[in-house]
Amino acid sequence: MKTMLILALIALAATSVVAQLDTTCSQGYGQCQQQPQQQVNTCSALLQQCSPTPYVQSQMWQASGCQLMRQQCCQPLAQISEQARCHAVCGVAQVIMRQQQGQSFGQPQQQQGQSFSQPQQQVPIEIRRMVLQTLPSMCNVNIPQYCTTTPCSTITQTPYNVPMATTCVGGTC
C-alpha cells in the first residue's frame, strides 16, 4: 500500500510538468535568448522511472509514459547550450534529492513550481553521478566536463530549468 502511494505521488509529480520562460530577442540578430522560470521538469521523473537502473524502482511504469517523458525532457535539453545543460543536470539532481528525502521521512513530494535553484544542502555525489551518467546517454546530448567536477551549489547560483522550445521569426519571438 505504501509503495502504491509512493508510485502514485511520483506519477503525479511527473505529470505536473510546467516549463515556462520569458523570451526576448536580441536586437539586430534575430536570436532568442531564453530566460527560464524555475519549474519542476520531467527529467528527474524520467531518470527515476525509466532508466535501466532507476533510482526509485518501479515495476508498474509503462513504456509509453517513459517515451513521453523522454520527449518532454530530451528535446528541449538538446536545444540549449552545454552550459545550460550543466545547470539542468544540477536542477534534476536537486529534485531527485528532495524527492528521496520526502520519501525517506514520509513528507509530501515536491509541489509544482517549487524552486530548486537555491539548494538547502549539497546534492549527494551518488545522485549527481547517476544523473551525469544516465541523462546524457538517454537524451544523446553532451554535458560539459566541468559539470563533473564543479559543485552544484556553485553551478546553480543562476536558476535554471529545461525550457520548452521557442522559435524566432525575423527577430520577433
From Swiss-Prot:
Keyword Cytoplasm: no
Post-translational modification: Contains 7 disulfide bonds.
Pfam families: Gliadin
Matches recorded under InterPro entries: Bifun_inhib/LTP/seed_sf (IPR036312), Bifunc_inhib/LTP/seed_store (IPR016140), Glia_glutenin (IPR001954)
Any coiled-coil regions, as ranges: none
Cleavable signal peptide: 1-19
GO molecular function, one term: nutrient reservoir activity
Keywords: Disulfide bond, Seed storage protein, Signal, Storage protein
PANTHER family linked: AVENIN-LIKE A4, PROLAMIN PPROL 14P
Record family assignment: Belongs to the prolamin family.
Role of this protein: Seed storage protein. Not integrated in the gluten polymer through disulfide bonds, unless incorporated by reduction and reoxidation during dough making. Increases dough strength and bread volume, but decreases dough stability when added into a base wheat flour.
Designated name of the protein: Avenin-like a5
